[in-house]
UniProtKB/Swiss-Prot annotation:
InterPro entries: Aldolase_TIM, OMPdecase_type-2, OMPdeCOase_dom, RibuloseP-bd_barrel. The gene is pyrF. NCBIfam families: pyrF_sub2. It is an enzyme of class 4 (lyase). Its EC number is 4.1.1.23. The active site is at K108. One of its GO terms (biological process) is 'de novo' pyrimidine nucleobase biosynthetic process. Keywords: Decarboxylase, Lyase, Pyrimidine biosynthesis. This is Orotidine 5'-phosphate decarboxylase.
Length: 305
């Protein structure tokens, strides 16, 4: 199997796109007409929830698949529905994988030692069960929080190497309060630069044939100045870039995120795609999501070409 970074590049070239569709879906934001279409009074509220959530997201994925290289599932929007949400997530992960799209679990997981290994087993690797190894999810990559240091990252990196998976470590995030910690000075460097240096170290042993590491960084689209500094530290790492659109990130600033080959980024768009029907005059949410993803893809390509 190819390394994660090589598979990602292969998909980028095939689709002529670096766009990732972010799935941050809550049941209350699904159109009423769609809920009425699938709501069955003979079923429980939980069964209706699972059916409607799956059917809506499945149709979003179908609508945008030609314009995106992958799908990023935000864990919180499934965890809010307890294990019922994770049943839906499991089905959607398999569904998306069958479409040959890159599948990212955005859970920002982290812990130490065996706890971190448990997270990595679940989402990247294998879990021991009665003397056998079982896979419960088939994600291609996961987001992680580096706050606990190497102890919390090592199990994920080891599974990236073993199973050809990917890792995106939070380095400089798009939220307004990211500066509270990430912009603190450590001697003569910002803390986010120190973290970027660690990301480089963690990823130097899992380099694909195309020369990119399977360990990348999350760098928010609202942080172009920081992105320049991080790119100097991580010349051969992919940046997962959230925050365009609603969060205030500008597509034209993406030129500061790419590497010297105008590569090295995948750009997430969530609400502008999954709730695009709110911005179009017609009520066809599938067509709206398709048009939104097409427009965003083309705008990104123009900005980084």
């Amino acid at each position: 199997m190819l390394n994660f970074s090589d598979r990602l590049i292969e998909s980028i070239k095939k689709k002529n796109s670096v766009l990732i569709a972010g799935i941050d879906t809550s049941i209350e934001n699904i159109p009423d007409y769609f809920i009425k279409r699938f709501y069955d009074k003979e079923k429980s509220e939980i069964d209706n929830l699972k059916t409607i959530l799956f059917e809506y997201i499945r149709r979003i994925i179908d609508a945008v698949e030609e314009n995106v290289v992958g799908v990023k599932f935000q864990a919180a929007f499934f965890e809010q529905y307890s294990y019922h949400g994770f049943e839906v997530l499991h089905k959607l992960c398999e569904y998306t994988k069958n479409k040959k799209l890159v599948v990212i679990f955005d859970g920002k997981r982290n812990d130490i030692s065996s706890s971190a290994k448990g997270y990595s087993n679940a989402y990247l690797g294998e879990t021991p069960v009665f003397g056998k190894k079982m896979r419960f999810f088939e994600f291609d990559a996961i987001t992680t929080n580096p706050y606990l240091g190497q102890d919390g990252i090592k199990p994920f990196v080891e599974d990236c190497e073993r199973f050809k998976k990917g890792l995106f470590v939070l380095v400089k995030t798009s939220n307004p309060s990211s500066a509270d910690f990430q912009d603190l000075m450590v001697e003569d460097k910002y803390l986010f630069e120190v973290v970027a240096e660690k990301v480089y170290e963690w990823g130097k042993n899992c380099i694909g044939k195309e020369g990119y590491s399977d360990v990348g960084a999350v760098v928010g689209a609202t942080q172009p100045e920081a992105a320049k500094r991080i790119r100097e530290i991580l010349p051969n790492s992919f940046f997962l870039v959230p925050g365009i659109g609603v969060q205030g990130g500008k597509i034209e600033d993406l030129k500061y995120f790419v590497d010297s080959n105008n590569m090295g980024i995948i750009v997430n768009s969530s609400r502008d795609i999954i709730y695009a029907y709110k911005n179009y005059v017609h009520s066809d949410f599938e067509k709206s999501s398709y048009l939104a993803s097409k427009n965003i893809k083309e705008s990104i390509n123009a900005a980084i070409s």
